[in-house]
Amino acid sequence: MPTTKCAVPLVSGAAGGGGSAELTRQLSSTQASPRFSFSSGVLPSLGSRGGGERHARLRRFIVSPYDRRYELWNNYLILLVVYSAWVTPFEFGFVPEPAGALAAADNAVNAFFAVDIVLTFFVAYTDPKTFLLQDDPRKIALRYITTWFVLDVVATIPTELARRILPPDLRSYGFFGILRLWRLHRVGILFARLEKDRKFSYFWVRCVKLVCVTLFAVHCSACFYYLLADRYPDPTNTWISAYMPNFHKASIWSRYVASMYWSITTLSTVGYGDMHAENTGEMVFTTTYMLFNLGLTAYIIGNMTNLVVHGTSRTRKFRDMIQAATSFAQRHQLPARLQEQMVSHLSLKFRTNSEGLHQQETFEALPKAIKSSISHHLFFGLVQNVYLFEGVSNDLIFQLVSEMNAEYFAPREDIILQNEAPADFYIIVSGSMELIELHNGIEQASVLTLAGMAKSGDVVGEIGVLCYRPQLFTARTRSLCQLLRLDRAAFLRIIQSNIADGTIVMNNLIQYLREKKEIASIVAVAKEIDDMLARGQMDFPITLCFAASKGDSFLLHQLLKRGLDPNESDHYGRTALHIAASNGNEQCVRLLLENGADSNSRDPEGRVPLWEALCRRHQTVVQLLVDAGADLSGGDAAPYARVAVEQNDAALLGEIVRHGGDVSGACSGDGTTALHRAVLDGNVQMARLLLEHGADADAEDVNGLTPRAVAEQGGHADMQLAFASATRHEPRKARPPPPASAIVPVPLRDGVDSSPSSSSRRGRTSSTSAASARSTPQRMANFRNSLFGVISSSHAFHHEGGYRGGGGGGGAAAERERSSSSPPLVRVAISCPESRGGKDHSSKLVFMPETLRGLLELGAARFGVSPTRVVTSGGADVDDARLVRDGDHLLLVTDKWVPPENRSRNQ
């Protein structure tokens, strides 16, 4: 049941429900007070029923001890306690019978405390067992009466009434007045609260408390000293008579100053000798006072020592750590460079902690939500611009930033060592680093190679972490660096829950590796990845758009063979054919068209592949697209002419017209045409060409202006002459696209398949077979533990019916294509050594059937032999069709067949 938000009143309302025996608690999570004091408020107990007790609605006329107005009342009483703390000992020692203004002030103060006694009967208290506010009036009264009620009442009795109650011999001592010092417990509670209040300095609160304790002790002692001298029968035999023989006639101020002087010299154990105890009573009191001073001095010195030591403890620990590190380095004879790195790192750590730059312990004590918000505020923009995370969702970046740790490193410090195990990678926030490649593990100037430099916003160590291989370089800081460290396990855990973003990260990494052609070690990693892609060992959603953007026709061919949708688009809405046409990659365009890519596909900006090829002068690609039925009418044809006008390209304008472009339509939202643009630019040549191709000189824009009117307003005489002399040409009609049935695949050039050449394929097959033979379990383990292995396994799980997360560009279309299409075709070379022809038997390239039985039946029909087994070229038996890969060479044999090497061995 929802409740309304309300503040706890000083005295709870009198409306309805009075007299209830039980505490009615209406709790709500919206009642949380922003003023809640963590030093005095009641914390809720654990469990679903434990929240909100401190915000309970109390009974009628019951005051919450945490109400702001009650706290102000207590703070006001503190001022009266300070008055009582000074006046009570003073009256006890110097004023036998208070009268006049002093007596009136005492009675006024007593009246305030009497009001507080009455109010206390209506103040709820915290139960020490349940830590809940108890608002039962009877329990409140019983608790108060059995604890501090008697002392509070006695301390409030007026002085005049107390003198009448006491016997005549004790009336002058004001014993009841001394009981008012009981109120000092309120000051102790105040200091305890201030010590926990973050608005006040703990150091100064403690200092003020110690000063107050010292002054109060000196003041009380001075008053007691004077009381002993004043009440002693022989005034000349007292401590004050040596300094002031007729002290009774001196002013009260002079007597008080003298008493304070002797009290403070005794407390400080100075003892100049001008004042000292004269009688037995003074000696006994002085002895007792000095014993008290021993404890008070120890208390003050101990507290001051703790305060001072606390401020210097960090420096002491730092010096001890530096000394220990230096001793360790010297004891084990470490190189000077390592010693310097150790000392620099420890010094930098001390400085960052002392200046509040890297309070790791404080940061770790915060809840995860607060830590994530802090990291997001500090580093989100930087991580968003890292090349590895270009194009990923903000959700992934937020998750990654939450797992990153900021660290400082001194100059010339090694962050990553070459060939060490990949555990973390780093993003540079500030500073710079150098990447060093060692030869044979020797660090000498003659064998060091500077592989590159890294600056703010760059990543180091990501290749080793993502590919799960030893680090390629040693990363060493050149200046003071602030780095973001990300653990490999945390990164892969996040990627597993964001497969679509993981694919983007993987593509970004592959693109980066391929661009770094000047570094041999990175080139080797890129080649290894390409080989694994070619062998089909990576089952993750690399898109056709990625392959087309890299111009990798072999990878594109492999992906198309797996059944990927040739019309899938990236996150910008561009298909692979758009990208291949824009890059002028004839081989990729041919492959896509052969596999059913739409030659007239349109991106969100209205561009078609033919336009991408035309505007970049890729004539061979243009011809391929035209032969496949492409034209410009499928896109936003009008803006094409405007581009030609702006570029002053008559040849491009002619191509636009020839391929079905529109030169007369509006090319922008304001209704302007390409002819408007030519007139505004004063380009008479382009205007004449447009008019020749059917542009309308009287087409109006949204303002009602025609190209002819614009020419007249601008006073372009040549332009007006062109309009006047131009004859009206009928617009050339765009060539209609051929029907779908008339579109045939692009013919093979010279009868050669447009997939990667057979020689190249054979070379790749042989090389990959050799590489596969050399593969070791360690390399396969590296692959499984790398980013590629994580994406592969996750993609396989999704493909088999597991969780289907969002894909990258065209992921949904590819998923539908995979679910509706048959398994990818596998081509194998088969031969039968037992057929006629002997060892010179010919091989035949066939599509692999779904079962081995089907393959044996196919071989029987081709070779005229009834084979019963399938073996590899190396003589290994094949028991399952799923073991066969594209490009394998298989032998179809009978049970009687013996491999040639075994036959020669038997002979």
Swiss-Prot record:
Keywords of the record: ANK repeat, Ion channel, Ion transport, Membrane, Potassium, Potassium channel, Potassium transport, Repeat, Transmembrane, Transmembrane helix, Transport, Voltage-gated channel
Gene Ontology MF, one: voltage-gated potassium channel activity
An example Gene Ontology CC term for this record: monoatomic ion channel complex
Compositional bias annotation for Low complexity: 754-776
Entries under PROSITE patterns matching the protein: ANK_REP_REGION (PS50297), ANK_REPEAT (PS50088), CNMP_BINDING_3 (PS50042), KHA (PS51490)
Job description of the protein: Probable inward-rectifying potassium channel. Assuming opened or closed conformations in response to the voltage difference across the membrane, the channel is activated by hyperpolarization.
Name of protein: Potassium channel AKT3
